[in-house]
Regions:
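Catalytic nucleophile-loop/oxyanion-hole region of alpha/beta-hydrolase
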Residues: 9-39, 43
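Short beta-strand immediately N-terminal to the catalytic nucleophile in serine-hydrolase-like folds
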Residues: 46-48, 74, 134
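Gly/Ala-rich beta-loop-alpha elbow adjacent to hydrolase catalytic centers
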Residues: 48-52, 56
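Hydrolase active-site cap/lid region
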Residues: 58-114
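Short alpha-helix in the alpha/beta-hydrolase fold that links the catalytic acid
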Residues: 120, 129, 143-152
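Acidic catalytic loop of the alpha/beta-hydrolase fold
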Residues: 137-142, 169-170
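Catalytic histidine neighborhood in serine/cysteine hydrolases
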Residues: 151-172
């Protein structure tokens, strides 16, 4: 059985707001439960690209059933705060304050989460299962350096990196 998940509010999910992976992780956990209700012996691999990679890592920090065997993230970001901060600087030459602070407060009020809370970096620190980190060196959206930060945050030795030379965002695999 294969399930392909797309981070998208309303039409594929119970979400109203784009959760940048943070809200979406709860939907993924429900899909895992559904798969296991169909086949209790299923072996599950979670894989995501870009925002899907963040969703994968954010899910990895939750209590997942033993049937979830491995996580594969391809060009994910460390946190919502970090990726928005990077984009503000890179694309617009703007500082974090006041825009990012205001946007994070608005997200907390409307969607129930703040941008610093929505952290793949914090979640991978709770992951005991194997994880593969993939990133392209020519990614001009999510900084390549975030892969190393995420890799170093994951405890244990059951982890690996794969660098895709010259690949952009979402083109590593």
């Amino acid at each position: 059985m294969k399930i392909f998940w797309m981070n998208a509010p309303r039409w594929l999910s119970t979400l109203i707001y784009v959760g940048m992976g943070w809200l979406d992780r709860k939907d993924v956990l429900q899909w895992i439960d559904w798969v296991l209700a169909q086949d209790s012996e299923a072996e599950i691999v979670l894989h995501g690209v870009s925002m899907g990679a963040a969703t994968t890592m954010m899910t990895a920090g939750e209590d997942t059933p033993e049937q979830v065997k491995v996580f594969v993230e391809d060009c994910g970001y460390t946190s919502v705060w970090d990726i928005f901060s990077s984009e503000l600087k890179l694309r617009f030459g703007l500082p974090e304050f006041p825009i990012l602070y205001t946007a994070s407060a608005t997200a907390r009020a409307k969607a129930g989460y703040g941008f610093k809370e929505a952290s793949a970096l914090q979640q991978v620190q709770n992951c005991e299962k194997p994880m593969l980190f993939i990133h392209g060196t020519a990614d001009d959206f999510i900084p390549y350096e975030m892969m190393g930060t995420l890799y170093n945050a994951k405890p244990g030795t059951n982890k690996a990196t794969l660098t895709a030379e010259g690949a952009g965002d979402g083109c590593s695999g």
